[in-house]
Amino acid sequence: MAQFAQVMAEVGDFGRFQVRLTILMGIPNFLAAFFIFGQVFMVLDEAHHCSVSWVKNHTFNLSAAEQLAISIPNDTAGRPESCLMFRPPPDSASLEDILSHRFNETQACDSGWDYPENRPQSLKKEFDLVCDRKNLKKTSQSVFMAGLLVGALVFGPVCDWIGRRPSLLMQVLLSGITSMATAFVSSFELYLALRFVLATANAGFLLSTNVLISEWVGPSWRTQAVVLAQSNVALGQMVLAGLAYGVRNWRLLQITGTAPVLLLFFYFWVLPESPRWLLSQGRTEEAKQLVQKAALVNGRPLSPELLNQLVPEKTGPSGNALDLFRHPHLRKVTLILIAVWFVDSLVYYSLSFQVGDFGLDIYVTQLIFGAVEMPGRFLSVLMMEKLGRKWSQLCTLTLAGIMYIIIIFIPGDLPTVVTVLAVVGKFASAAAFTISYVYTAELFPTIIRQTGMGLVSIFSRVGGIITPLVMLLEQYHQAIPMVIFGSLPIGAGLLCALLPETRGQTLKDTLQDLEQGLPAGSHKTAPQRQDMEALGRTSSVRVAVVKSSYF
C-alpha cells in the first residue's frame, strides 16, 4: 500500500498546481499587512490644545492668537500646552486683568480639544486619543495582538474540525465584515471590540494559509513556498505606505484597505481542500480526486493503480505541553525557544509600530521597512544553508538587538542615521522570525513537534501583546523601551549557542534519536513504547495524517 507522501512525490513537490496555490495563499498575507499595521497611520501626532469654551463664548473682540494666549499656557519650548488650560476667570474680570495673566492657575482640559482645521479626520482626532487618553493608541494595539492569540487558539481546532478550505473561507469573510464595520463605528470602545474580532480572523487565515501550503508542497520546496507566501506581508507593508499617503481620512483608509478582501469570494470556486485532511477524515475518494487533479495540472498524471493504494500514514501519538519539561534536553530546548519566539515578536512588532518615531517621513520609512523585510526573509533561507540554523538565529537576533542599543546613543538631530539603524534591525528581525519557524520544527522530535510549536507560538503572541505596553515606558524615560528592545534579543541570541545544530540532519522521530544525536531511522513510523514512557505517558500507535497546527 502506498503512503500519502509517496503519492505526492509522484505528483511533484512544487509544480504548477502548488505554484498557483502559493500565489492564492499569498493574497490574504498581503492584506494582513493593512489589518496589523494600518492603525499606525490613523493616529499620527498632530498639534492640539484644550478647547476653551469661555473664550469662544465671550464678547471680547480678540484674534485667534490672542484667544489662545489668554486661555492656554506655553510649555518650556514656548509652544501652547497640549493638555493644560488656564482656569476660567470670574465673570466680573476685565479684559485687562485677563491679558495681564492675573488669573494664571492651570487645570486639565474640560471641554475637549481643538485640532488644526485643515487636517483630514484621523482616529486620534475623532476619538480624542490625547492627554489622559493617549495611551489608548498603544493599548489598542495590544488588544489586537491579544486577538491574534485568541484567534490562533480558536481557529486552530476549527481548522482541524471542519477542514482547511471552509475554515479559510470563513476567516476571510469575517475579516472583511469586521474590518468594513470598523470604518463606521461611533465609539472607540466599539472600535476596540471590532479590532479584536478582526485579529482573531486574521490569526485564523494566517494559520490556514501556512497549513494548506505545508500539506500540498513537497519537502524539497516547502520552506521556500511558506517564506514566499509570508513575504507578501512585506509587499503589503510597501503598498500600505502609498495607500496611507494618498488617503488621509481614517474611515476612507479603512474602507479602501478592506475592499480587496471582499473580492476574494472567488476562493469559493478555486480553493482546494487539503488531501491530507480529507484522508484523516476518511474521505479517501475526495482526496484521490484532488491529488489526481493536481497531478494533471503538473503534467504528471497518476495511474489508477497507484491512487487505489493510497492509505493514511501511521504516526505515533503526540505529547502534551508538560511532556516538554520532563526530559532534560527537551526542557532546555523548550525554554530557550520560548525566549527566542517571545523576543522575535517583541522586536519585530516594536520596530513596525514605531515606524514614525525615527525622525524621517513615516511613509518613506514604512516603504523602506517593507522593502527590506522581503529580502530579509529570503536571505534567511540562504543563511540557514551556509551558516547553519543555530548561528543564523544567533546572529540575526543579536544584530537586531545591537541596532536598538546603538540608536540610544544617536542624537535626535540625526534622523537619517537612526532610520538606517532601524532598517537594519527590521531586516534582522524579519530574518530571525523566519529562521525560528524552520529551526524550531527541526529541534522538536516528531512525537512532540506540534505541541512544542504551539507552546512557543503562544509566547510569541504574548510578546506581541506586551510590545505596545513596553513602548508606554517612554513617558518615564525615552531610553527605557530601547534598552528592553535591545538587551532581550541579544540575550536570547546568545542562548541559541546552547542549542544543537540541525542543518543537514534528518528530523528526529523519538527521544532515543534525540539522546543519541543520530538521524531517525527510515524504518521508524512511530515512536517506541519506551519513548512514551520516558515522557511519562504510554499509548498505542494510532492512525493520524494531520496533526493540529494551532499557531
Curated annotation (Swiss-Prot):
GO terms for cellular component: apical plasma membrane. It comes from the Eukaryota. Signal peptide: none annotated. Glycans are attached at N57, N61, N74, N104. The lineage of its organism: Eukaryota, Metazoa, Chordata, Craniata, Vertebrata. Keywords: Cell membrane, Glycoprotein, Membrane, Transmembrane, Transmembrane helix. Glycosylated. InterPro entries: MFS_dom (IPR020846), MFS_sugar_transport-like (IPR005828), MFS_trans_sf (IPR036259), Sugar_transporter_CS (IPR005829). Residues 1-22, 164-167, 217-224, 273-332, 376-404, 449-452, 500-551 are cytoplasmic. The gene is Slc22a13. It catalyses: nicotinate(in) + a carboxylate(out) = nicotinate(out) + a carboxylate(in); orotate(out) + a carboxylate(in) = orotate(in) + a carboxylate(out). This is Solute carrier family 22 member 13. It holds the Pfam family Sugar_tr. It is a multi-pass membrane protein. One of its GO terms (molecular function) is nicotinate transmembrane transporter activity. The keyword DNA damage does not apply. Belongs to the major facilitator (TC 2.A.1) superfamily. Organic cation transporter (TC 2.A.1.19) family. The chain crosses the membrane at residues 23-43, 143-163, 168-188, 196-216, 225-245, 252-272, 333-353, 355-375, 405-425, 428-448, 453-473, 479-499. Residues 44-142, 189-195, 246-251, 354, 426-427, 474-478 are extracellular. One of its GO terms (biological process) is negative regulation of fatty acid metabolic process. Gene3D superfamilies: MFS general substrate transporter like domains (1.20.1250.20). It is found in: Apical cell membrane. Anion antiporter that mediates the transport of orotate and nicotinate in exchange for organic or inorganic anions. Translocates orotate across the apical membrane of proximal tubule epithelial cells. Possibly involved in orotate renal reabsorption and nicotinate intestinal reabsorption. Orotate transport is Cl(-)-dependent. PANTHER family: SOLUTE CARRIER FAMILY 22 MEMBER.
